[in-house]
UniProtKB/Swiss-Prot annotation:
Official protein name in the record: Probable ubiquitin-conjugating enzyme E2 26
Family matches, as CDD domains: UBCc_UBE2O (cd23837)
Region entry Disordered, spans: 1-21, 514-543
Pfam families, per the entry: UQ_con
Species the sequence originates in: Arabidopsis thaliana
Keyword terms, alphabetized: ATP-binding, Nucleotide-binding, Transferase, Ubl conjugation pathway
Length: 543
């Protein structure tokens, strides 16, 4: 008999051994064997499975749930994604290392007890198509080889504390052609260690029954679409983003740019503490939707803010992080601000070293009313100024020497080229943020880019097809005058060149459908008209 096929004999009147089986009563449509004690596998005790062969020597193993499709590992370093090393040095094992391995499920009688009352005909074969790795060394008289199928692909990245974690798997045999084939739901447990925390079952994988099934036609499972799993994951991530507080406090900021400077809250004056707390209150009540802030309880002088790039700008859908420190003389002087640049200069006011140039900070020229006013200016005003004055639609004109050229043909042309380059740098910033998310924003970064991945890919496809930068709104091309223009040839080529890197990062986040079926290029009126003109010219020349 092949190792991946189990032949189920006709239901005996007398069970194997000397036991006498009592007549069966009517069984419900679904039998849940979780209520059994799994006497053929081990004894459940205190939510753990004790293996009889290992004499009860217990090793506690962390569990995880497949119902939760979100990735919970912390942000990794720039070049350490494959091993999923988090900020605290916890090395998590990639799911792919153990999910492709076969396992042997011993004690055929466990299945026999469940399937006997269902009158499965002799010669019918059941192929169980997916499962996890087993390290069990015990021998068995009969076994089933369970292999991982494509239906596993939709679960995204899962962080585990150990490789050898046994799981509960559901299999369903739905009624189709004959009334005697009721739905049977059972769970197979193969303990890797004496004590194991029981975990939640995934959604049952539907089997399709074939009445003509024989030794050469096993009953096979239809894989669950990864697109459906991704849709469920998207709902969870959208819910996470909705519930994510725009302002909150955290315990520490070990990776903060100003962590090594300043002092603890207890060493500041009462007036300083009172002013900072007033800023906290304003941020908590009045932060706009596109800005989120985290303040440090043990170091009240530290803040971290993230701003979402606005639609219609070369920064759309991106995340831009800023580390902020209140000086000892605050509010007599403005806060110190450092931009997480990743070595990229995406704006005349945002240097690749992290310096932020703004009149409100005293790092840029401006009128008296544009500078920091100790009795009036607030932290909220500073963040909104960065959002509106720096991360704007035409950052080229942020440079004082170029302001006078705004509205001229030459100035607008140069601004267009500059903005196209900024968008490419914004894509690189996305990759940088995904690979190295700032502390306390790890899940936020992952969920944000998971949810926005399709809009970003659609925008890239539109730009490749000739749509002008900034014309994409909610995944579609705006029907505006500027939408009848076209992006430069270099811009289209550069977007096409770097786009795959961005898509690869989205796939690592769990957006599997981008790898299976890339988004089709977006078309706009401009590109369609150009193709029609070319067709007309060809037809005229042929005459």
């Amino acid at each position: 008999m092949e190792p991946d096929v189990v032949e189920i004999p006709p239901p005996p009147l007398i069970a194997s051994g000397s036991r006498t089986r009592k007549p069966r009563k009517a069984v419900p449509e679904v039998i849940d064997v979780e209520s059994y004690e799994f006497r053929n596998v081990g004894v459940v005790k205190d939510n753990n499975v004790v293996d009889k062969k290992n004499k009860g020597k217990a090793i506690q193993v962390d569990s995880f749930s497949f119902n939760n499709v979100q990735s919970h590992h912390h942000g990794s370093s720039l070049l350490n994604l494959e091993t999923f090393q988090d900020y605290y040095g916890h090395k998590n094992i990639p799911f792919s290392e153990f999910a492709n391995q076969p396992i042997d499920v011993d004690d055929y009688s466990m299945y026999q007890d469940v399937l006997d009352p269902k009158d499965v005909p002799a010669g019918a074969e059941v192929t169980v198509p997916w499962g996890l790795n087993s390290s069990s060394k015990g021998t068995a008289k009969s076994s089933i080889s369970i292999m991982r199928s494509q239906s596993m692909k939709g679960y995204g990245t899962v962080s585990l504390a150990t490789t050898n974690v046994p799981q509960l798997w559901d299999y369903t045999l739905p009624q189709q052609n004959q009334a005697i084939y009721s739905s049977v739901s059972f769970s197979a447990v193969q303990p890797q260690t004496p004590d194991v925390v029981m975990v939640t079952n995934p959604t049952p994988n539907p089997f399709s029954y074939d009445a003509s099934a024989s030794s050469s036609h096993p009953i096979a499972a239809e894989p669950i679409s990864s697109v459906q799993d991704s849709s469920n994951a998207r709902k969870l991530k959208e819910e996470f983003l909705r519930d994510f507080k725009r302002f909150d406090t955290v315990e520490d900021f070990s990776d903060h740019h100003y962590a090594s400077k300043g002092k603890s809250s207890k060493q500041h004056s009462k007036n300083w503490v009172k002013k900072v707390q007033a800023d906290w209150k304003i941020l908590e009540n009045d932060l706009p939707e596109a800005i989120s802030v985290r303040a440090c309880e043990s170091r009240m002088d530290l803040l971290r803010a993230v701003i979402i790039g606005a639609e219609g700008t070369p920064y759309h859908d991106g995340l831009f992080f800023f580390d902020i420190q209140f000086p000892d003389t605050y509010p007599s002087v403005p806060p110190n601000v450092h931009y997480h640049s990743g070595g990229l200069r995406i704006n005349p006011n945002l240097y690749n070293c992290g310096k932020v140039c703004l009149s409100l900070l005293g790092t840029w020229a401006g009128s008296a009313r544009e500078k920091w006013l100790p009795n009036e200016s607030t932290m909220l005003q500073l963040l909104v100024s960065i959002q509106a004055l720096i991360l704007n639609e035409k950052p080229y004109f942020n440079e004082p020497g170029y302001v006078q050229s705004a509205g001229t043909a030459s100035g607008e042309s140069k601004s267009k080229v500059y903005s196209e380059n900024v968008f490419l740098l914004s894509l690189k910033t996305m990759v940088y943020s995904i690979r190295r998310p700032p502390q306390h924003f790890e899940e936020y970064v992952q969920n944000h880019y998971f949810v926005r991945s399709h809009d970003i890919v659609k925008a890239c496809n539109a730009y490749k097809a000739g749509a002008p930068l900034g014309s994409m709104v909610k995944g579609g091309v705006q029907d505006l005058e500027e939408a009848r223009q076209s992006g430069s040839k270099k811009f289209k080529t550069d977007v096409a060149s770097f786009m795959q890197t961005v898509v690869d990062e989205f796939v690592k986040l769990g957006v599997k459908e981008l790898a299976e079926k890339p988004e089709p290029p977006m078309s706009n009126a401009n590109t369609e008209n150009q193709s029609k003109k070319k067709t007309r010219k060809r037809s005229r020349s042929s005459r």
